[in-house]
Amino acid sequence: MKLSDFDFDLPSELIAQYPSSKRDHSDLLIAATPPIKTKFYNIIDYLKEGDLLVFNNSKVIKAKLNLEKNRPLSKLAYRDKFEGDMECRTAVYTNVREDSSTGSTYKLPLEVELEKRSNITINLNQRLSNNCWSAFAKPARRLNIGDEFHFDNHKVIIVEKLAIGEIKVKFELDDISVFEFLDKYGEMPLPLYIRHHEAQKSNNERYQNIYSSIEGSVAAPTAGLHFTNDILNKLKAKNIQTTFLTLHVGAGTFLPVKTENIHEHKMHTEYCSITPDTARLINKAKQEKQRIIAVGTTTLRTLESSCNNGTVKACDFETDIFITPGFKFQTADILLTNFHFPKSTLFMLICAFAGFKEMHKLYKYAIKEKMRFFSYGDATLLYRKI
């Protein structure tokens, strides 16, 4: 299939810039015939006793760091004043002139070396070791191997330049962990399409799932943002089971597909973990023909990556699974997810799960109903097409 097969027109005003007033007050679209539009707090009505909901418990870290670097410019002939935020570092005064009207002399700088301050943003991507991470830098061309950036008694060092825009950084910290450092100096890494950043404290809360517990994601597993403690209690009261796995979402989740032949696209790798207890619950539900509901595409990708001949394995691993139409699913019966970008790997995934034509039709309905898209947007409950 071609990349253009997964395109659709999305009005920009439907891209959610803010979360709903309350987590569970977002809209929920049930992929029934015809579609049912309701509120998320009614999701309990579409689940039944014995269902098993599988959540991703990864916690978003403050993975965005703002750096400042003084960038030297070439030596220039410069006769008048210095402009902007440039600072004169050195000046060679080789010509002394006399003011004929006053008789006084003055020095004319013929050659100066200038410096300009550059603002650089890095977004951590994946943990490579205790103190080393891969990251995406913008603009990466302003960074050099060996550059050091100081945060009080701590240092961030550029140790390698990888693919275009990607770097490797090392943290040299004074008696704190990388996560503690990021919590103090970093910012929540909101997607670029969310243009407001003024309410950082609010984003720290709302761009995090209430059940998140294991630090490591640089973007939220957004399907879970709608859940509240009240909904979790109602699930328990209805004898609906819940369990957790981990996939640390990397910054590569926002990278676009650039090849028209979708099978030429290379997925980023992400760390996953499934505990023995979680694997046992999932396999038991499958054996007893109970429905398995994957909360989010990250959960579904982890389940399918770990499944061998219909059995989910307990393991720690990395996955770069790329799910497109034609994929044979072995785990989830239902997928809860937000609305995704045109031509994205996630839209391809839901087309594989619930049907290519069906998803184009459902998204057309959602757009007509002015439902809200992407991270802070509304949710949809999709049923696997057999």
From Swiss-Prot:
Pathway: tRNA modification; tRNA-queuosine biosynthesis. One of its GO terms (cellular component) is cytoplasm. InterPro entries: QueA, QueA_dom1, QueA_dom2, QueA_sf, RPE1. One of its GO terms (biological process) is queuosine biosynthetic process. Keywords: Cytoplasm, Queuosine biosynthesis, S-adenosyl-L-methionine, Transferase. It comes from the Bacteria. Transmembrane segments: none annotated. It catalyses: 7-aminomethyl-7-carbaguanosine(34) in tRNA + S-adenosyl-L-methionine = epoxyqueuosine(34) in tRNA + adenine + L-methionine + 2 H(+). Its EC number is 2.4.99.17. The keyword Nuclease does not apply. The keyword S-adenosyl-L-methionine applies. It is found in: Cytoplasm. HAMAP family: QueA (MF_00113). NCBIfam families: PRK00147.1, queA, RPE1. PANTHER family: S-ADENOSYLMETHIONINE:TRNA RIBOSYLTRANSFERASE-ISOMERASE. Belongs to the QueA family. Transfers and isomerizes the ribose moiety from AdoMet to the 7-aminomethyl group of 7-deazaguanine (preQ1-tRNA) to give epoxyqueuosine (oQ-tRNA). This is S-adenosylmethionine:tRNA ribosyltransferase-isomerase. It comes from Rickettsia canadensis (strain McKiel). The lineage of its organism: Bacteria, Pseudomonadati, Pseudomonadota, Alphaproteobacteria, Rickettsiales.
